[in-house]
């Protein structure tokens, strides 16, 4: 993927969380001062002004669902694969967790260069950003081999970009890590196939579902993704595959009562109710060995 595309896709979730006023996202954005608007590529689409609202809903529910599961697991270390410009480091690390962010070179080089702007100088809880291609088993072994404590691995927004063989390579590496050191693997977005269309439909009504295909087409072109090759796109498929690979899998609703979601404040009561009902029918997964 070209450097510019990597930067744009990595910025989207941060921009959405910042627009909602999520505190650590606001601080992270202020520190980074990223340039450009990653949503500009969608400006030509119908309902373009409403699209950020839909995307921010998806960004927040996945981010908060993952965070809640990470805190429940309470493992001392967190490995955030395909971390992008996630503000999760500013939420988790001050609580005493060792945070490691991993992504492709353009993202990790940018974040590492800005470390002094992002983090306090005495941030002992921050283990750093690591460059890793999750589809390269040797790279995964190099990054994961340095860890020696129970860990929560989180993959938010990563699975839809990987082929079946690439997912299996990543899963095998994570399984070996968990067998050695203990911990779990948090997958917040296992119902990716329907999450986007159902969220757009709940927020925008009948016209929402119709725009999803055009949004997907823009994104697929940007990241050079072939949706015909996508697998593990439903929770049932992922549970089956991970079970076959030797994981013990626990499913939980994507949205759980008590989760605080700022995105709901801008919706009508009816739209919020539709959205929550949709999310409660979808899953996140915690896998262990």
Regions found by a protein language model. Name each.
Residues 1-79, 83-130, 147:
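Rossmann-like AdoMet
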Residues 86, 196-289:
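Rossmann-like AdoMet/SAM-dependent catalytic core
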Residues 131-137:
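Conserved SAM/SAH-binding loop
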Residues 136, 159-161, 191-195:
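Short, catalytically relevant binding-site loops at active-site mouths
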Residues 137-147:
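Short amphipathic alpha-helix with an adjacent loop that forms part of the alpha/beta core around
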Residues 139-140, 161-174:
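A short, conserved alpha-helix within the catalytic core of class I
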Residues 150-166:
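A short SAM/SAH-binding and catalytic strip from SAM-dependent methyltransferases
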Residues 178-193:
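Conserved beta-strand signature within the Rossmann-like core of class I S-adenosyl-L-methionine
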């Amino acid at each position: 993927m070209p450097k510019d595309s990597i930067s744009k896709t990595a910025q989207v979730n941060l921009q959405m969380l910042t627009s909602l006023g999520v505190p650590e996202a606001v601080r992270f954005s202020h520190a980074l001062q990223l340039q450009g608007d990653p949503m500009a590529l969608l400006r030509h689409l119908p309902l373009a002004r409403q699209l950020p609202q839909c995307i921010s809903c998806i960004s927040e529910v996945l981010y908060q669902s993952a965070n809640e599961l990470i805190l429940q697991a309470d493992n001392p270390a967190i490995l955030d694969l395909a971390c992008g410009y996630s503000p999760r480091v500013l939420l988790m690390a001050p609580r005493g967790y060792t945070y490691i962010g991993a992504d492709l070179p353009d993202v990790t080089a940018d974040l590492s260069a800005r470390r002094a702007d992002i983090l306090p100088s005495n941030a002992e809880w921050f283990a750093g950003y690591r460059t890793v291609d999750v589809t390269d088993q040797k790279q995964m072994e190099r990054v994961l081999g340095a860890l020696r404590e129970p860990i929560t691995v989180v993959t938010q927004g990563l699975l839809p970009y990987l082929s079946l063989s690439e997912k299996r390579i990543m899963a095998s590496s994570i399984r070996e890590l968990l067998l050695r050191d203990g911990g779990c693997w948090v997958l917040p977005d296992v119902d990716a196939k329907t999450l986007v269309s159902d969220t757009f439909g709940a927020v925008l009504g009948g016209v929402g579902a119709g725009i999803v295909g055009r949004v997907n087409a823009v994104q697929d072109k940007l990241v050079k993704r072939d949706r015909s090759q996508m697998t593990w796109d439903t929770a049932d498929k992922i549970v089956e595959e991970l079970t076959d690979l030797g994981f013990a899998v626990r499913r939980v609703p994507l949205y759980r009562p008590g989760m605080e979601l700022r995105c709901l404040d801008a919706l009508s009561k009816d739209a919020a109710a539709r959205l929550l009902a949709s999310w409660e029918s979808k899953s996140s997964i915690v896998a262990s060995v």
